[in-house]
Amino acid sequence: MALSKIDAANFLTGTIPQGNVANASLGAVTALPAAIPTGKVLQVVTGVTYTTTTSTSATYADTSLTASITPSATSSKILIITDQFMRKDQNNTYIGYKLFRDSTELNYIGDLIAYTQNSDSDANGIGTTYLDTPSSTSSITYKTQFATLSGGTITIQADASSGNERGRGTMTLMEIAGW
């Protein structure tokens, strides 16, 4: 059996003759054909809240974090990214966290544990990333809700390290061209 040696350093060198390329150079390509979906971002909306919400209940309540967007096409998708902080007041406190489009529940994150080795207050980040297909060109409002699933007290938009009730919650909505 014959062995061949391939010089990998020079294997992929060279040029394509200009006559074989439709444009003068690949750098001159400015657009893809319409049949190729690009998934480009059409608009970005951000919602911010500093409002503190506290609960000791297993009944879900709004966190005060909302953002609204009006998609430009029914084929668009909406990428939702939320980022909030919560504080619990005792060890082994479980939290439930939900994302809604108007009144429709989209995403549920349940049994998140806010755990420390002692019963001291502890702050943790909480959030979600979700790709929605609303199939609408009407205004849409997204919001988050939370509940305490195991007793104890949960405070959203809380900063335990400074001992105050301030914190920032953000929601970013990105309309992505449909594909």
Language-model segments: residues:
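Glycine-rich, low-complexity segments
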Residues: 1-52, 178
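Terminal beta-strand-rich extracellular "head" domains
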Residues: 48, 52-54, 59, 70-179
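Short, solvent-exposed loop/turn segments enriched in Ser/Thr/Gly
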Residues: 61-63
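Extended, low-complexity regulatory regions
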Residues: 65-67
